[in-house]
């Protein structure tokens, strides 16, 4: 994934992680997972509920926070 693709993902997921916001993650096959984001990298999200699940980002359709979160996007100007 390009660096540009991470400009929104990383700050959003990091805000959810830092603020311990419960999330619902919908997978492309329709399955709904719930928990807190423990960690993430370029390819996976660790979702903690009663156990920690490794969810591959390519399988994620939507991430829905239980409440609104504020996050800052540091965007470099296009050149």
UniProtKB/Swiss-Prot annotation:
GO biological process: regulation of DNA-templated transcription; regulation of RNA stability; regulation of translation, ncRNA-mediated
A GO MF label: RNA binding
Subunit and interaction comment: Homohexamer.
Function: RNA chaperone that binds small regulatory RNA (sRNAs) and mRNAs to facilitate mRNA translational regulation in response to envelope stress, environmental stress and changes in metabolite concentrations. Also binds with high specificity to tRNAs.
Gene3D superfamilies to which the protein is assigned, alphabetical: 2.30.30.100
Family, similarity comment: Belongs to the Hfq family.
Disulfide topology: none
Keywords: RNA-binding, Stress response
A cellular component term, taken from the record's GO annotations: cytosol
UniProt protein name: RNA-binding protein Hfq
HAMAP family, alphabetized: Hfq (MF_00436)
Matching PANTHER family: RNA-BINDING PROTEIN HFQ
Residues covered by the Sm domain: 10-69
Superkingdom of source: Bacteria
Record has RNA-binding as a keyword: yes
